[in-house]
A protein has these predicted regions:
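Core alpha-helical transmembrane segments of integral membrane proteins
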Residues: 236-267
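Short flexible coil/turn linkers enriched for glycine and charged/polar residues
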Residues: 59, 87, 152, 227, ...
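Cytosolic juxtamembrane amphipathic/interface segments immediately preceding
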Residues: 24, 220-236
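Hydrophobic alpha-helical segments of integral membrane proteins
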Residues: 89, 206, 210-213, 229-237, ...
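Generic recognition of stable, solvent-exposed alpha-helical segments in well-folded globular domains
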Residues: 106, 205, 209, 228, ...
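Conserved C-terminal guanine-recognition region of P-loop GTPase G domains, centered on the G4
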Residues: 2, 6-94
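Structural motif corresponding to the C-terminal cap of alpha-helices
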Residues: 15-18, 217-221, 237
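Alpha-helical transmembrane helix bundles of large polytopic membrane transport and channel proteins
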Residues: 64-65, 74-223
Length: 267
């Protein structure tokens, strides 16, 4: 239920389509759908987060990916090609080390540019055998009256109905009851051509595509030989609270040295 509410906000903001006007939890305050989506992914566990990236690409919203914890990934011998990932997904990918503030300026600039340009991610399609099995269902959903009623990208609507989403099926049955038998038959035909239940096949395919993408944009090698003392100083002086204390300590040390040297010279 919570996931569905989040999805509705991401898709429509407070301007819900007619099919959702009867929902009991209507928006209580005016707000727009987001101009841009910002996904923070963990570079040390990238494969897991890429599955969500594939799902977000279906929403038809500009997307920016923050590739965080890049320093820790390199220390573990994981080297991510941010440019290759950006090209494959069709979205800006910005390398960041958030706790040190590194890359945040570039990240906000990329998000602002994406919101202004309204450039959506490249369509991340299912594997060919699934696309073939879903062609009849996709043809049904291509009807203008259905697209107008739901006001969502067709690839997203196709995935929701293919995965047998309760809410989308219920709304389809309420507003287009004559279409439901066709959708049911198309799902059954698609499932007949696949080796496992359709929803399981879609989940496995998404996991497989994320794994392939991960292998394409990453390289495993020797852990980066970083100088620990430099990293310790970075963490100290870039810390939101400890940085001030460290800076004051250095300033006090400089003053002490100046006065000591002056005293020696005067003597």
């Amino acid at each position: 239920e919570a996931d569905r509410q989040v999805l509705m906000v991401l898709l429509w903001g407070d301007r819900w389509p007619e099919i959702a006007r009867h929902e009991p939890q209507q928006p209580t305050s005016p707000f727009r759908a987001p101009d841009v989506l910002l996904q923070v992914v963990d570079a040390t566990a990238l494969e897991r987060d890429l599955e969500l990236s594939l799902e977000l690409s279906l929403l038809g919203r500009p997307l920016v990916i923050a590739l965080n914890r890049m320093d820790e990934a390199r220390e573990k011998g994981i080297y991510v090609n941010a440019r290759a990932l950006s090209e494959r997904l069709g979205v800006p990918v910005v390398a960041t080390v958030a706790h040190m503030g590194m890359g945040l300026t570039d990240l906000f600039a990329a998000a602002l540019a994406a919101a202004r340009e309204q450039a959506c991610p490249l369509a991340q399609q299912c594997s060919e055998h699934i696309r073939e099995s879903l062609k009849p269902l996709n043809a049904i959903l291509a009807r203008p009256e259905i697209e107008e009623a739901f006001r969502v990208p067709r690839p997203l609507l196709l995935m929701q109905l293919a995965e047998n989403d309760d809410w989308f099926l219920r709304e389809l049955a309420e507003h287009f009851p004559a279409v439901v038998p066709e959708v049911t038959a198309a799902r059954a035909e698609a499932q007949r051509t696949l080796p496992r239940p359709l929803s399981d096949e879609l989940h496995a395919d998404r996991h497989h595509r994320a794994a392939l993408l991960y292998e394409t944009v990453t390289r495993l090698g020797a852990p980066e030989d970083t100088e620990r003392w430099k990293r310790w100083l970075d963490e100290l002086f870039l810390h939101p609270r400890g940085g001030l204390i460290g800076s004051l300590a250095v300033f006090a040390l400089v003053l002490f040295m100046v006065f000591e040297v002056s005293a020696v010279l005067d003597g």
